Amino acid sequence: MNLKEQVDLLTNKPGCYLFLNKDNEVIYVGKAKNLKKRVSTYFNKAYNIKTTRLIREITHLKYFIVDNEKESLLLEKNLIKKYRPKYNVLLNDDKTYPYIIITNQKDPMYKYVRKYEKKALRNYGPLPIGSNARSILLTLQRLFPLRMCKGDLKKPCLYYHLNQCSGACFKTVDSSYYEYQIKQVDKFFKGEINQVKQTLVKQMQKASDNLQFEQAKRIKDQITSLDFITAKQNVDIVTNKNIDVVNYEINEEKICFVMLFYRLGQLTYKDEYIQNYEGQDLDELLNSYLQQIYQKNLYPDVLLIPNEIDLLDLDENLLEFSSYSFNNQDDIFIKLAKQNAVDSLNKSILSNNVNSGDELEILDQLQQISNINKYPKRIEIFDISNIYNQFITGACIVYINAKPVRNEFRKYNIDSQYTSDYARMKFMLEKRFLKRIKEKEQLPDLIIVDGGIIQIHAAKEVLNKLNLKINVIGLSKDNNHKTRYLIDIFEQTIDIKNFKKLYNFLTSLQIRVDEYAKSGFRKKYHNQLNDQILLIKGVGKKTNLKLYKHFKTIDNIKNASFDELNKIINNKKITNLIISNFKK
């Protein structure tokens, strides 16, 4: 029976399905409310060459019928665990999410754990990476003592004498005591910790006065941990809810999921997961990722998901708290998660662009496709970036044998008098190669310009002027602003999407040179902003930082009204100084 016949015979009932290859290996496990409808979608879609690997590899399938969706969820989980299929989302079993819990016992106690515990009375987390969770735990034990010992010791334990145990070691502790302490801990994790900090500061000062410097340092470390866990974010968030935000990014080969955990208005933790993308159903992949996340984490009040994901395709246990973005604050969350996914995927490309042993193959292929007459051992890549046609920065990055040579990366300041892409590229290349000729520095075997025919012509004009015989090619992007085309030495456009290793390599070059150029104009932009504000007598760094964080650009500050400025500065005298200065 061929594969199509197997699909046609599927039932409309809920269940799990397994795709197998010619070696009878399970390569993908999925679940469905309607098996026939779900599996049929894999073979009815119009996939491109890149995303049909999964489909091409399937030779036969198996399936299990279940009574309801909850059963299929459990079965899917067990099947994935058993077979570990290569096309499923498989989060690392060793991955941990730090939590501080309060146990659900007659005499509860604190514990530091590596995942959410369903049976606990309280779960606080996931805690911020770098927050020194154990130090926070010590602070809680000192300030809001619960049981610290095994209990029922018939005598006070050492911790009781240190005021760190409830006394369950030798007496019956009233439940109201624990209720009060736990309420205080709840407030602590909501960020209501001014009183806590004041107590710690007094203890630190007392220890210092008594020359107990080690004790004072330990308390100081605890205060630092409190500052970390309750630190304000760059985005103003007004909510008392626990919010998780998921988003993703896909390129030609991989998919990256990112989950941001917000606890009481603060971003406390980020999870990211990258895997090969071979045309799997996106809703299924996201579902699988979320299920594995929540095996180890507490359900939030709200889970924000991207609008393009079908909410109804989520599992029942996720539907209860899942939502699309409904306001500006939600939009900020979703965009931030998206940006994190994009950045993570870009970093993955940069770190894995060339596997050891592939360099020769990639450069040989580049030589052939580009029609160049010389093996491109040394490649120099050029790009130009700007913001609003100001702060124009050129960048050159260098690769030797397909590996970046970071100490040879250079940035070039380009005057705003050069208004066209042609003039800017010409200026940068002339400046670079005149200096390298003068200092007898090594020249490249190949120049790659980020751009099209205009940038290539600018490069060729400079090389002709300097009598240099160096091959020049270009890299251009598609409508989605992703690397797609190579322009060879004959100025022919070649789609490189299907040359996997070369495509990944050139994509990484384009990402790296773009980021390097942007880092240059950002620095100049920030410096100019700081310089203009700080030149005003009476304006300090703190005021400058407040203005920059809120208004973003110097033009926005200049155009702001008195009330708008004073709302941020909260000092009428300084506000008048700034306004009068910009009117000069």
From Swiss-Prot:
Gene that encodes it: uvrC
Entry annotated with the keyword DNA damage: yes
Secretion signal span: none
Keyword field: Cytoplasm, DNA damage, DNA excision, DNA repair, Excision nuclease, SOS response
Protein name according to UniProt: UvrABC system protein C
Family: Belongs to the UvrC family.
Gene3D superfamilies: 5' to 3' exonuclease, C-terminal subdomain (1.10.150.20), GIY-YIG endonuclease (3.40.1440.10), UVR domain (4.10.860.10), UvrC, RNAse H endonuclease domain (3.30.420.340)
The protein's role, per its UniProt record: The UvrABC repair system catalyzes the recognition and processing of DNA lesions. UvrC both incises the 5' and 3' sides of the lesion. The N-terminal half is responsible for the 3' incision and the C-terminal half is responsible for the 5' incision.
Residue ranges annotated for the GIY-YIG domain, each copy included: 12-89
GO biological process: nucleotide-excision repair; SOS response
SMART domains with a match to the protein in the record: GIYc
Residue ranges constituting the UVR domain according to the UniProt record: 194-229
Assembly and binders: Interacts with UvrB in an incision complex.
A GO MF label: DNA binding
Pfam families: GIY-YIG (PF01541), UVR (PF02151), UvrC_RNaseH (PF22920), UvrC_RNaseH_dom (PF08459)
Entry's localization field: Cytoplasm
Superkingdom of the organism of origin: Bacteria
Organism: Mycoplasma capricolum subsp. capricolum (strain California kid / ATCC 27343 / NCTC 10154)
One term under GO cellular component: cytoplasm
PROSITE patterns for the chain: GIY_YIG, UVR, UVRC
